[in-house]
Amino acid sequence: MKKRILRSSAILASSVASLFPTGAAKAEKPGEVSKKFRESVLSRPDLKSADPIGQVDPPPEKSRYPWRVKIVTTTFWVGEAPTKNNPVPNHISAWDAQWAKHFGGTDDPDPARRTNFFPAKFVPRQNPFYVALPYNDVCKDGHKPEASRVIPWFKEAYEGPGKTVCKGRWIAIRFKDRVCYAQWEDAGPFRTDHWQYVFGTERPKPNLNRGAGLDVSPAVRDFLGMGDTDVTDWRFVDFDEVPRGPWATTGDNNTFVINDREKGTRVVSAADASGRSK
């Protein structure tokens, strides 16, 4: 019996020893094991992006469009008068010479004069969730030379020479733990030619507004809870990625509204056809 116990103990000791490389079973100095463990963990490439409290960055999203992060973001609005830091009046846009008229008036940014993301005085005739990015795809001679090459959706959205493929495009804006969706309706801030940032990997160019690279409407500002000037992330999104929300309810230019109207027309037409066939 005693021999069996000794033999079993020897087998167990041999199995434990096999788990360590040669010499690993010798005594370590105090703290040496924990030091080696820390070094082995910190040498792992998947943990090198950990933040100070040890949380590993999440894997990148699999999306057609990447996030542009930490972009200085300013608030602008339809009908805005020119100022020192905004020399271009916003009663017109890069693609609409009567923007304020088509919108229905000035999109007053004062929170005290707004309700439910709308200016209190009227219901906008266009989507109050809008943005500006520093690129315009058209010029007096048609599309800019680089437009067909750098705009990812150019071919699928092309409707003829000189007709913008950027106006109305949806983007997502992220601030802290909230994400808002809005339509691209103007070019700016300051520039209309920076395709290397809008569609590429460059950062926004320096300007009078702390290097701002995105303008957002008062509705976007209010939904996100951001300041008039703040820092956000943004990216383009295809329409089928946009969930319904307050950005889906209003505006003749709003993809949701347009689609809902078309569905309603088809339903009415089908009902009329059914009635006539009886």
Regions found by a protein language model. Name each.
Residues A17-A27:
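Bacterial Sec-dependent signal peptides at the C-terminal "C-region" and cleavage site
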